[in-house]
């Protein structure tokens, strides 16, 4: 079973006192004390980000680790990744993440891990990366960016958290710079099983997610049912 959990925002890095999304991700592995690996690539392997990951996940019933491409934990990245139950990708610069992953061959390794049942998840840049394309500020202004294409469609994180995200996503789809896709508020996460949206969950009441597309020459937002984890 292939699983991807794409967060618009939230999780330990944005809600350190509310780990409900992080616990939800762990629960999908169906293993007691799942082995979870954090990929902080998009942040430039920020040590502060890595420390916050451990601070959060050491309070949960799991075995946390991380993969830095600046200081790889193993010369055999394939075996290291394939031994994990969950891969959790942090936020930051999506373009840099994609370039580094491709240079190291990590994009192919992660695809094989996903196909073999490793749960893959991420926030912001770590969510955009799984789709065909997404809205990113990697180069400054919000623009479109081609991504890995594990999932069909585009993705926009921080839909309610950053005021320019929603209008930028609408404009990019309207002008055919992006294909139709999904948008998620901070605190909302889309859970895909075998390439199909299974459900949407949230760490806070009121967090929403949408299917966004062109309909009769206008942008249409279709609200998705959201299961509140509180």
From Swiss-Prot:
Its EC number is 3.4.21.-. One of its GO terms (molecular function) is serine-type peptidase activity. GO terms for biological process: proteolysis. The active site is at residues 124, 158. Disulfide bonds: none annotated. Keywords: Hydrolase, Protease, Serine protease. InterPro entries: Class_I_gatase-like, Peptidase_S51. It is an enzyme of class 3 (hydrolase). The keyword Transmembrane helix does not apply. Belongs to the peptidase S51 family. This is Uncharacterized peptidase YgaJ. It comes from Bacillus subtilis (strain 168). The lineage of its organism: Bacteria, Bacillati, Bacillota, Bacilli, Bacillales. The gene is ygaJ.
């Amino acid at each position: 079973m292939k699983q991807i959990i794409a967060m618009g925002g939230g999780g330990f890095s944005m809600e350190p006192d509310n780990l409900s999304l992080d616990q939800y991700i762990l629960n999908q592995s169906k293993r007691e004390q799942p082995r979870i690996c954090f990929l902080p690539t998009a942040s430039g392997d920020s040590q502060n980000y890595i420390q916050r990951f451990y601070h959060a996940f050491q309070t949960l019933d799991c075995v946390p680790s991380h993969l830095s491409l600046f200081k790889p934990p193993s010369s055999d990245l394939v075996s290291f990744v394939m031994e994990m139950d969950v891969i959790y990708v942090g936020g930051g610069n999506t373009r840099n993440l994609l370039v580094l992953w491709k240079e190291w061959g990590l994009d192919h390794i992660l695809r094989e891990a996903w196909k073999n049942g490793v749960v893959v998840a991420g926030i912001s840049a770590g969510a955009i990366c799984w789709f065909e394309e997404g809205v990113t500020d990697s180069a400054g202004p919000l623009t479109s960016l081609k991504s890995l294409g594990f999932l069909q469609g585009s993705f926009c994180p921080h839909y309610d958290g950053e005021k320019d995200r929603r209008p930028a996503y609408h404009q990019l789809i309207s002008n055919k710079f992006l294909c139709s896709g999904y948008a998620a508020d901070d605190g909302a996460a889309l859970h895909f099983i075998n390439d199909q949206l299974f459900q949407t969950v949230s760490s806070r009441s009121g967090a929403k997610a949408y299917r966004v597309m062109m309909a009769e020459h206008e942008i249409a937002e279709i609200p998705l049912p959201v299961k509140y984890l509180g």
